[in-house]
Amino acid sequence: VVLFFIDLDGFKRLNDTLGHPTGDAVLRLLAERLRRCAQEGDTVARPGGDEFAIVHPVLSTSKSPTAIATELVRSIARPYDVGGSRLTLTASVGVSVAAQDCQEPDRMLKNADVALYRAKTDGRNAFRFYDASMDNHLEAKRDLERAVRNALARGEFEVHYQPIVDVRSERTC
């Protein structure tokens, strides 16, 4: 089983600027595109907001997960015609493969979400397959954030200012 976890890039901005009716229309068009990308036996779901998931049972006649993810990203990036406007959106996709990553559905969803986060931090409009090093990266980031919060609470930071000097007049700007 392969799980594709899909999140639209910048959807909140679209909703905020063009309104929820436009956002809802885009979501309906997106759902239709995802159904067309889906293979026989796939389940397409919308867990909430602008997130979608596709559960793909790997069959001998299936396309490769890489080919499916590529098709998803390309299909989602095609323009949407809504209310006389032509809108362009992109998506980030996280992919978790059961045989490689785990067998438990909750863990697969977590892994796909971690991979989705990596796709977003790597520049969006992309897909990433989960690998265990992603967990290490997230743990290191959490450790750093915790250390900074603790250092702030203990007053361990000192601020030093470097003046900006005008070289001609030798005066501080």
Would you name each region that the model predicts?
Residues I54, L89-A91:
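HATPase_c (GHKL) ATP-binding subdomain of two-component histidine kinases
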Residues A140-C173:
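Active-site core of bacterial EAL-family cyclic-dinucleotide phosphodiesterase domains
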Residues V44, E71, S75-D81, S85, ...:
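Cyclic nucleotide signaling catalytic output domains
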Residues R35, K120, R149-A153:
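Short regulatory alpha-helical segment in sensory/regulatory domains of signaling proteins that mediates
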Residues V1-V2, D9-Q39, A45-G49, A53-I54, ...:
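Conserved long alpha-helical elements within nucleotide-processing catalytic cores of c-di-GMP signaling
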Residues F5, H56, V95-V97, Y161:
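Sensory input modules used in signal transduction
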Residues L3-F5, F129:
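Core hydrophobic beta-sheet residues of small sensory/regulatory alpha/beta domains
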